[in-house]
């Protein structure tokens, strides 16, 4: 018996680094085996979601202020003498941004933003000359230079200093116009709902391009290739992905029989079942905010959330079977105690 936390947080960090993405896939494979052969369904449903990173909403002024504050600390480590530390200047310039949407404060906010960018550029230029190429801080300096040089219309922009791989996605949500993180593709069984694959995309690709690596992961983890993948309209553009048939909503064939139409409707109704599964991954299994670093952290966090979801589903199924067995046992006991009249 020990009073205290089960382990230190750094131990989990070392564990994740040791197992990597391949080890996380093995953990997911073990949770799929809990469900037996019922998990290996011929038809699966596929959908994509956004795994948001633990970063603030990026703006030019926020990034410039972070560059100034981080650059001042880095200058102290490398013995670079700056003319000033900007400890009072940066908060004043950030305070000027509060009224940027008002008529009186718009010009003041633009002037403060230009001043912040000028200060950040000055600090980065001094660090660029002082920090050696082999230093660990060199990557930070290069990232800061890219942030200060990027424009509004540029592609592959950097939105975070500590997470430069983050990209912006707009899924058309009314309450959340832009999301910053990594796109995730999730595959689940059509009837059982067991998550068979969870693939994190390194770039913001079209949904159909994410299907092939996701199905390859299903083949590695679950040990089979699904015959049919049912997706939404985001997967349009291809009828087959390797040996797997891709089915998406559409007008259908003109000469389709009533049976084919009914089968298609049932398929697309079942496709919608993956939406609450993804919602539970976010609300119950920590997929709504990813605190792990880098693209490897994106992949591991997604796989661990899927691996935690499958045993939860299995335990609910076992509980339902137990309740069903107890009800049958109770009915038999009552019928034996009070037999029905002949």
Over which residues does each language-model region extend?
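Active-site- or DNA-interface-adjacent structural scaffold in DNA-acting proteins
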Residues: 1-165
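Short, conserved catalytic/metal-binding motifs centered on acidic residues
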Residues: 6-12, 42-52, 186, 193, ...
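Flexible, glycine/threonine-enriched loop-and-boundary segments that flank and lead into catalytic domains
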Residues: 161-177
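Flexible loop/turn segments at secondary-structure boundaries
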Residues: 167-170, 194-196, 204-206, 235-239, ...
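Electropositive, glycine- and tryptophan-enriched low-complexity nucleic-acid-binding patches
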Residues: 174-221
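Extended hydrophobic-aromatic, low-complexity segments
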Residues: 195-198, 207-210, 220-228, 239-241, ...
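Helix-centered, glycine/charged polyanion-binding patches within enzymatic domains
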Residues: 224-296, 300, 322
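A short, flexible helix-boundary coil/loop motif
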Residues: 288, 312-342
């Amino acid at each position: 018996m020990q009073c205290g936390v089960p382990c230190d947080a750094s131990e989990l960090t070392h564990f994740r680094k040791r197992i990597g993405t391949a080890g996380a896939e093995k953990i997911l494979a073990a949770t799929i085996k809990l469900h037996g052969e019922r998990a290996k369904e011929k038809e699966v449903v596929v959908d994509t979601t956004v795994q948001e990173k633990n970063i603030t909403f990026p703006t030019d002024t926020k990034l410039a202020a972070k560059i100034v504050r981080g650059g001042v600390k880095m200058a102290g480590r490398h013995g670079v003498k700056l003319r000033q530390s900007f400890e009072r200047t940066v908060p004043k310039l950030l305070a000027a941004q509060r009224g940027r949407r008002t008529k009186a404060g718009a010009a003041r906010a633009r002037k403060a933003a230009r001043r912040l960018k000028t200060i950040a550029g000055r600090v980065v230029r001094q660090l660029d000359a002082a920090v050696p190429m082999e230093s660990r801080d060199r990557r930070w300096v290069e990232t800061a230079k890219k942030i200060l040089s990027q424009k509004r219309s540029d592609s592959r922009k950097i939105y975070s200093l500590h997470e430069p791989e983050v990209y912006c996605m707009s899924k058309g949500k009314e309450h959340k116009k832009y999301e910053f993180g990594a796109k995730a593709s999730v595959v689940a069984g059509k009837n059982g709902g067991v998550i068979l694959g969870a693939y994190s995309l390194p770039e913001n690709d079209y949904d159909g391009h994410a299907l092939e690596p996701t199905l390859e992961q299903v083949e590695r983890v679950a040990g089979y290739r699904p015959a049919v993948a049912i997706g939404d309209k985001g997967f349009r553009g291809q009828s087959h992905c390797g040996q797997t048939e891709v089915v998406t909503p559409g007008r259908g064939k003109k000469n389709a029989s009533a049976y084919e139409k009914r089968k298609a409707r049932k398929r697309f109704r079942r496709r919608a079942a993956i939406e609450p599964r993804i919602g539970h991954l976010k609300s119950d299994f920590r997929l709504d905010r990813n605190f792990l670093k880098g693209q490897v952290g994106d992949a591991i966090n997604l796989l661990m959330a899927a691996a935690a979801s499958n045993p939860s589903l299995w335990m609910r199924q076992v509980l339902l079977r137990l309740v069903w067995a107890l009800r049958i046992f109770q009915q038999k006991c009552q019928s034996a105690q009070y037999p029905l009249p002949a």
